C-alpha cells in the first residue's frame, strides 16, 4: 500500500511528512522523517532595539508643568543640544538689559528718545517730499525764454496819431492803434443793435486814444490789414471781413470781434501787454 503523501500530488507540501508502514512484501516508497528542532535566533544585545514599546518606556510619564513668577529668570527646555537660543542683547537698550530690574524707571527717557527720533524723521520726510513736488511742478512750468516772450513793453511815443503799429507777441501779431479824436467819436456813436457781436467801444479800451488788439481774424485766423475796409479799421483779405477802428466786426463772415489782450499802462508813455 502506497503512502498518502506519495499520492497527494500538489498537496504534498501542506500535508504532514510522515508515513505509515503496512505489512506486505513491498518496501515503502517514502521513508519516515523526523522533523528537526528549529534553532532559536540570537539577538544582538549590544545594539538597542528600537520599537514602539521601547520608545514609549523612555517618554516622560508625568504631565509637563510651567512655572511663572516675578524676578524669576526664564528657563529653556532643550529638545536638542544643537539648538542655539537667540540673544537680542545687542538690539536692546542699556536700561532694559537686566531682567531683574524694573523698566518703569527708564520709561520716560526711552519714550522721549523715541518721540525725538520720530519727529526728526517726519520733518526729514516732509522736507524731501516738498522738494520732490517743487521740482516736479517747476519742470512743467514754462522756460525762461518763454516767460520772456509772455510780456512785451511798448513805447507809445513811437506811434504817431492816426497810425497803427504791429508787434509780435506770443507768436501772434499785435496791433496798437493811436486813434484820432474823430475816430473816437465815430466809434462811440455806433449803436449796439447794428453790431453782430455787440460791445461798446469804452468796454474794449482803457484809454480812448489807444486800441490794442490781437491781429488774428476770428473767422479762419488770417491777419487783417490795418487802415483798410469799408469802416476804416481793419480788413481781412482772405474772406472779406470788415472791422471798425475799435476792432468790432461790421461786415463779412467773421463771427466775433478781434480779441483784446490783457494789458496795463505803467505810465503815460509805456504799456505792458501780457
From Swiss-Prot:
One Gene Ontology cellular component annotation held by this UniProt entry: mitochondrial matrix
EC code: 7.1.1.8
Cellular compartment(s): Mitochondrion inner membrane
Enzyme category, top tier: translocase
Gene3D superfamilies: Cytochrome Bc1 Complex, Chain I, Rieske [2Fe-2S] iron-sulphur domain, Ubiquinol cytochrome reductase, transmembrane domain
InterPro entries in alphabetical order: bc1_Rieske_TM_sf (IPR037008), Globular_prot_asu/bsu (IPR011070), Rieske_2Fe-2S (IPR017941), Rieske_2Fe-2S_sf (IPR036922), Rieske_Fe-S_prot (IPR014349), Rieske_Fe-S_prot_C (IPR005805), Rieske_TM (IPR004192), Ubiquinol_cyt_c_Rdtase_Fe-S-su (IPR006317)
GO molecular function: 2 iron, 2 sulfur cluster binding; metal ion binding; oxidoreductase activity; ubiquinol-cytochrome-c reductase activity
Binding site residues for [2Fe-2S] cluster: 217, 219, 236, 239, 241
Rieske domain segment(s): 187-272
Side of membrane Mitochondrial intermembrane, spans: 141-274
Domain of life (superkingdom): Eukaryota
Main location: mitochondrion
Cofactor: [2Fe-2S] cluster
Mitochondrial matrix side: 79-103
GO biological process per UniProt: mitochondrial electron transport, ubiquinol to cytochrome c; mitochondrial respiratory chain complex III assembly; respiratory electron transport chain
Cofactor mode of binding and number, as noted: Binds 1 [2Fe-2S] cluster per subunit. Fe-S cluster delivery to the Rieske protein is mediated by components of the iron sulfur (Fe-S) cluster assembly machinery that reside in the mitochondrial matrix (including HSC20 and LYRM7).
Pfam families, per the entry: Rieske, Ubiq-Cytc-red_N, UCR_TM
Miscellaneous section: The Rieske protein is a high potential 2Fe-2S protein.
Family membership noted in the UniProt record: Belongs to the Rieske iron-sulfur protein family.
Protein name listed in UniProt: Cytochrome b-c1 complex subunit Rieske, mitochondrial
Native source species: Homo sapiens
Upper classification of the organism: Eukaryota, Metazoa, Chordata, Craniata, Vertebrata
Gene symbol of the encoding locus: UQCRFS1
